[in-house]
Regions:
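Long, low-complexity, charge-biased intrinsically disordered regions
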Residues: 1-199
Length: 199
């Protein structure tokens, strides 16, 4: 796989190679999600195995450590890589487990902290709601000539909020939907509203 690195078509070529391998092992993709595979119990693996891949990082889920170890061994025979053992962070999300309750949930505290630092919001005072109830964002607040600095910063903030909404913060979805209406012509009012969501 080393020759794939650096080529513009590398991710696609790697995905096709991984997909062919997983399908040869009895896996199939889940619906329209082409980077998540599931293998039903049976044969050399007596329980369901789920694999999620992001470029060359794989997250493997199954019930028993024995089955997972066997699958990891088989996978690492085919693809050169390392076994990072228990996952703590994946795609900017930390996995928090309660072994006694047999539960797990995702948080993005680290990602959120990086976003706050990137936009100099680390010392901001928290607010009770992401958007002020009296704020009405409007096209009337759009400038006739967009300041490139405001435009770039606004798009960056809204992009970061989008990732939070999609992963762990659906409570920010309304704010995100309102802010995303003004990606082409944000003004100072829109930028202030975006900063408030980060607070």
């Amino acid at each position: 796989l080393k020759p794939l690195y650096g080529s513009p078509s590398s991710p696609r070529a790697l995905h096709k190679t991984m997909d062919a391998y997983f399908k040869s092992e009895g896996f199939d993709t889940i619906g329209f999600e082409e980077s998540v595979w599931v293998r039903p119990a049976g044969g050399k693996y007596p329980e369901d195995i789920y694999v999620s891949a992001h470029v060359d990082d794989c997250l493997i889920c199954c019930k028993s450590l024995d089955v997972m170890s066997k699958f990891k061994t088989d996978l690492l025979e085919r693809f050169k890589g390392t076994d990072e053992k228990e996952v703590e962070e994946y795609l900017g999300c930390e996995l928090v487990r309660d072994r006694k309750a047999r539960t797990g949930h995702l948080v993005q505290a680290g990602y959120g902290a990086r976003v706050l630092r990137a936009f100099n919001m680390w010392d901001s005072h928290p607010v009770a709601t992401p958007m002020d109830a009296t704020t009405r964002l409007s096209k009337l607040d759009c400038p006739t000539v967009v300041d490139p600095h405001v435009h770039r910063k606004y798009r960056s903030i809204v992009g970061c909020i989008s990732y939070l909404v999609n992963m762990t913060r659906p409570d920010l979805a309304f704010s995100f939907s309102q802010l995303s209406k003004f990606l082409q012509c944000p003004g100072d009012t829109h930028l202030s509203a975006a900063y408030r969501v980060l607070a």
